[in-house]
A protein has these predicted regions:
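Short, polar/flexible loop-turn hinges at active-site or ligand-entry regions and domain interfaces
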Residues: 79-84, 105
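Charged, compositionally biased N-terminal leader segments and the immediate start
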Residues: 1-23
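An amphipathic alpha-helical micro-motif enriched in hydrophobic residues
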Residues: 41-49, 54-79, 87-94
Length: 116
């Protein structure tokens, strides 16, 4: 039974909050730190690469989910320390991508691939 609500990403954030809950969460998840989770993040990125190399779309989808979980995990760790949260991560990458693509989002005309 799914006890979470909202969009799938909201549900994933709620799931991580539950896993990290100080008294009702998972003992393993509660003990994790940025440093202890980092190797899993790298491992998941390599698993995405492997699934892409195998052209296995089902595995790509699954591994991207595992990688997304790592981002949500790190964001939750940061939120608990008052550093930032998942929404801030998303806002920052949105801003960065818009700034890096003035030819798409700005007043500049469309550029060819050679000029990008």
């Amino acid at each position: 039974m799914n006890e979470f609500s909202g969009s799938p990403i909201d549900q994933l954030k709620q799931l991580m909050e539950r896993l990290r809950h100080p008294t009702e969460g998972c003992p393993w998840d509660r003990e994790q730190t940025f440093e202890s989770v980092a190797p899993y993040t790298i491992e998941e990125a390599y698993e995405v690469e492997d699934a892409i190399a195998r052209k296995d779309s089902e595995a790509i989808c699954e591994e991207l989910g595992d990688l997304l979980l790592q981002i949500v995990f790190h964001s939750r760790l940061a939120e608990e320390q008052g550093l930032f949260d998942f929404d801030t991560v998303a806002e920052k990458i949105n801003t960065k991508m818009i700034e890096r693509h003035p030819h798409v989002f700005g007043q500049e005309e469309q550029l060819s691939l050679i000029h990008i």
